[in-house]
A protein has these predicted regions:
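Conserved beta-strand in the GNAT
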Residues: 29, 33-45, 57, 62
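Conserved acetyl-CoA-binding loop-helix of GNAT-fold acetyltransferases
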Residues: 63, 69-82
């Protein structure tokens, strides 16, 4: 990855992946200089608050730039389907509309997925079922809380699943704290158990303001500037 801001985060992500390989995670990437890859693992070991026994969970699925529309995504998804033979099905987290860091719902639907549960404010759990008699996957209740106990200022929950979170939970949050004079707290989820009981459906990065969820998008000072007025309106 060429982005210098992510260099340390890439090392952390590799360490995170190495530990997950022991828990059944599969990482497959197109042999090209681009972000074309898929990660999946047994849902029981996913770092997400879902209840999906005997399902495969797609942890990250990314086809970027000029590689879109060439069938690479379909090939990678087919690899996941093939590796999931004998399972109850495959699950993934998406949204009712296109959002950063979430694979598009329309793509999953085109490949036989359907919505089986939702979590506020906009998350959807999608499933491709192989066993019609298996229980449908569900978000855990914690994913639907969308609140944290620390109700003062900005709280960011994050993991090393994304190579960008390390940088953007550092200097960028410092800049927000200094500019707005609000408390900023970082909470790094370091175990599967913490992630599986998180108060958000997206454990890679979730931001809470005055105790309530505001976004899963990685915040910069510029992004927070745009959020500031809406935060006052929604929580006033």
């Amino acid at each position: 990855m060429s982005d210098k801001k992510a260099q340390h985060g890439v090392s952390l992500k590799k360490e995170w992946l190495a530990c997950r390989f022991q828990e059944g995670l599969v990482f497959k990437k197109l042999d090209a200089n681009g972000k074309v890859f898929i990660e999946y693992l047994p849902a029981e070991n996913a770092w997400v608050p879902v209840d999906a026994p005997n399902y495969t969970f797609i942890n990250c699925f990314w086809v970027s730039g000029s590689y879109k529309g060439q069938g690479y995504g379909a090939h990678l998804l087919q690899e996941c389907i093939r590796d999931s033979e004998g399972k109850a099905g495959i699950v993934a987290v998406s949204s009712h509309k296109k959002r950063p860091y979430l694979s598009e719902k329309s793509y999953y639907v085109k490949h036989g997925f359907e919505v089986c549960d939702t979590a506020p404010p906009y998350f959807e759990l999608l499933v491709k079922r192989f066993d019609p008699d298996a229980p449908l996957p569900r978000f855990k209740e914690s994913a639907k809380q969308q609140t944290v106990a620390d109700g003062n200022g900005l709280v960011v929950l994050y993991t090393d699943q994304c190579p960008f979170t390390d940088h953007y939970t550092g200097d960028e949050l410092d800049a927000i704290e200094q500019a707005y004079g609000i408390p900023v707290k970082r909470v790094k989820l370091t175990t599967k158990e913490q992630a599986q009981n998180a108060p958000s459906a997206f454990t890679t990065y979730s931001a809470f303001y005055n105790g309530r969820f505001v976004t899963h998008e990685i915040l910069t000072k510029a992004k927070f500037d745009k959020l500031w007025n809406t935060l006052g309106e929604s929580q006033g």
